[in-house]
């Protein structure tokens, strides 16, 4: 059995690296979602004229990992209070969004955000919960970016700490290497 979800959490290199080794995740594909341009390029998305956000499509086995577990990991590596920004990555293409494919995902995402807000841990959460409209896979050179370029500056400074945080906090959900 396989299910799918679409998450925008800033740079898709980060999101792919974070979810890639999680038990129950079958595939993580970086791409673009939520905009109006058909088959956009990276350059077009970065221009902020397409309406798309850098997004990952996550294919997962719901018998091994729940959508709530995926949301917990997602919220652990993003700043849900900044609009159109994650760290130094600024622009609408770096916005945070959950693109739900059904009412169950919508309900779970909305409830998760309500519970986070009620916890007092964050000020106002700006992660949008939007119906899935489209997803376009990113160019091949974006796939497995962190794995292929671990010594690149952005990978060392931005991606690696997020991956390490998830491996420490969710060690019991990491695939055996």
Curated annotation (Swiss-Prot):
It comes from the Archaea. It catalyses: L-methionyl-[protein] + [thioredoxin]-disulfide + H2O = L-methionyl-(S)-S-oxide-[protein] + [thioredoxin]-dithiol; [thioredoxin]-disulfide + L-methionine + H2O = L-methionine (S)-S-oxide + [thioredoxin]-dithiol. It holds the Pfam family PMSR. Its EC number is 1.8.4.11. Belongs to the MsrA Met sulfoxide reductase family. Has an important function as a repair enzyme for proteins that have been inactivated by oxidation. Catalyzes the reversible oxidation-reduction of methionine sulfoxide in proteins to methionine. This is Peptide methionine sulfoxide reductase MsrA.
